[in-house]
Amino acid sequence: MTVAEIDRVNIFMAVRRAERPARRAALSLALPLIVFLVVAFVAPILYLLVTAVGNPETREVLPRTLEALQNWDGASTPDEPVYAALAADLKVAKDNSTAALLGKRLNYEISGMRSRVLATARMVEKLDTGPYKEKFLALNQDWGSPETWAIIKRNGGSLTPYYMLTALDLKQAPNGSVERVQGDQAIFLDVLGRTLFVAGLVTLFTLILGYPVAYVLTIAPKAIAGIMMLMVLLPLWTSLLVRTTAWVVLLQSDGIINDVLMALHLTGERVQLIFTRVGTVIAMTHIQLPFTILPIYSVMRSIPTTQLRAARSLGAPPSSAFWRIYAPQTLPGVVAGCLMTFILSLGYYITPALVGGPRDQMVSNFISTYINRDLNWGLAAGLGVVLLVVTLAIYLLFLRLVGADKIKLG
Amino acid sequence: MNFAQRMSLATDNPVDALVRFEDVKKSYDGINFVVKDLNLDVFRGEFLTMLGPSGSGKTTTLMMLGGFEQPTLGHILLDGKPVERLPPEKRNIGFVFQNYALFPHMTVAENVAFPLRYRGITGAAAKEKVRQALGRVSLDALGDRRPAQLSGGQQQRVALARTLVFEPSLVLMDEPLGALDKQLRERMQIEIKQLQTSLGITMVYVTHDQSEALTMSDRIAVFHDGRIQQLADPKTLYDEPSNRFVASFIGENNTMPCTLLGREGGVAIARMADGTTLKAAGANVSGTGANISVSVRPENISLAGKGVRAGLNRFSGKARDVFFLGDHMRLSVEAFGGQLVTARIPARQARHFALGEDVVLECGISECRLLEA
Ligand SMILES: Nc1ncnc2c1ncn2[C@@H]1O[C@H](COP(=O)(O)OP(=O)(O)O)[C@@H](O)[C@H]1O
Ligand SMILES: [Mg+2]
């Protein structure tokens, strides 16, 4: 380093030293929030990622069996030592009541495995000595199947691709290759597509309805703008559940909306709105409107009224002035508003559950089902990861397309 | 034909007015008029400034002319034809806004080319015009920049170029230099004035800065409270303000309340608050109003010389404040029983005054003006 460089470094260090107290003060102010975010946001997401690939059951319940399977050729029926190890593991499992856990986990990949494991565990309890192989095979032929053993062996690792693959309608064949699941089992890509489609539709509707509202808000006299703003914000101050329930009431076949449609003779008979996708989209659009409007409004408000006037004075007719001068300048707000609504819509859960039909359930509904009813945390986490990745991908895509500086949330 | 000749012609032949306001009134709320009884002709090639304090209705007047606001009553004629039905884009009027209103999402060149596409000028012809317009305001090299990358002065020039590029018959400017620092403002004043003269543009310019108005204008319309208080060329406005508002708004003026005693020839005799009298010019003041004053500029008051001379008012008072300002001295004197009178004493006459010291001052009768409120 030259003398000048050393000087520069010294100055740099001196500046850092001089500003250290201010930096510490700033950090200490932000610390509670940082701690909160780590505990309440980062940690759960990490846990989600781990759960989506975690595979503890087989390892914990069948340690001896996995050990014995080490030397298995993978093609033939295993020999007696494997069955003996399995018997020993299942005895312990029976005592610890972990057999059900194992059965449930293996059942995801081999149907009927749950009851087979439980029945075998019950049988093993009564056996004192081997040889075990015939007894196992006598109880259930499939204990002799190399595929069963291949899957058990495969699940000996601490990580599994199973949940992620399932969430993407894929599965691993016993020989390890990845393939598409068949027919009516392939549901998750459909659900994902439907979720994206509904979110896109809701975003589009909120934009079409919200953009003019945001514009009127910026040009209306103060008093009227205040009242309009209140009406835009009011839904935000009402609980989501309450609003959704209100829509359930409104959308009934004998509800107000149908009454009005009938009274206006717009339809001859009552329209099925509740438990349909139309209903879901209507309710979600209503709930999401403020999220689209507010960023657009805030950007519009920052555009001086002289912009349109300047365009007119330079010769642009009103429509041309709007599209060439005004609309491009509102783009940051439009992108921010749409992104917000789209991403929030991807995670909708209560509204589709209450207003939508069985075929309108979104990814979140499945996540909830897997957590609450099936206790399948792995698959719930797998779906969660897919949703997270899709959301991030869309976010990054938007950033790429319009540039980070073009997104203004406030 | 220079401007003065044209103007004298114009007064004979009113058709030469490019713009005419006829009894224009404007109210936004239906209760208060912010522009009241506006009658004004703007002549071809003229630089007319609307000067007045904030809220006096200048912008409103300009907006009506530009087509962005409708007169509540009265008519605006452009080239002899009423324009009420004409939308802004059909008026072919250039408008430079207070905040420039450059389009932030376009480059400088795109900004300047914007008005051309609506006039059917595209491609190479448009490029050439943009180049010329930017050259005219010395911004040749900055065509690819965005407005946000320019300094305030440069943005101002872009706005100017964008307006001049389509050769409008009339250019309106609303406080275009308000956001610039003093030095730049003064340079831009001269540049704008030069452009206006060399291109022969008719200009209606709005400002609240009297020195700007005096520098640039052929004629100045002083606005106050929605009315034109006086319409005159800068010199007349400065020397012969027609009322107290104009007197105090343009330059500095001592305003001293008085009552009218009578007249001697063309000279009015005014009695001041303490009973002393002053002579003042002011032929057109009836003197019946209650609100009369004698108005005299500080630079027209001097320390009294030896001996009494004709044509001068002389009065005495006690020194209050003295500020030495380099080229001159400001001396405030309490005279006429409590009235503060400020005199601007040239530096070579400056001397020390003690607080309360008796001072005798004098001022020319023709420079004392009898004014009504
Ligand atoms: N769009 C508007 N709506 C209501 N009142 C306005 C509007 N524009 C101006 N005014 C009012 O009209 C008066 C004159 O304003 P303006 O023409 O902007 O004056 P200036 O340009 O001389 O400052 C002010 O009192 C202002 O509050
Ligand atoms: Mg104004």
Which sequence ranges carry the predicted segments?
Chain B
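Helix-to-loop junction immediately C-terminal to a conserved catalytic motif
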Residues: 66
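Glycine/charge-rich catalytic "coupling/switch" loops of P-loop NTPases
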Residues: 2-6, 239, 272-322, 347, ...
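ABC ATPase nucleotide-binding domain helices that frame the ATP-binding cleft
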Residues: 59-62, 158
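ABC ATPase nucleotide-binding domains
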Residues: 47, 88-245
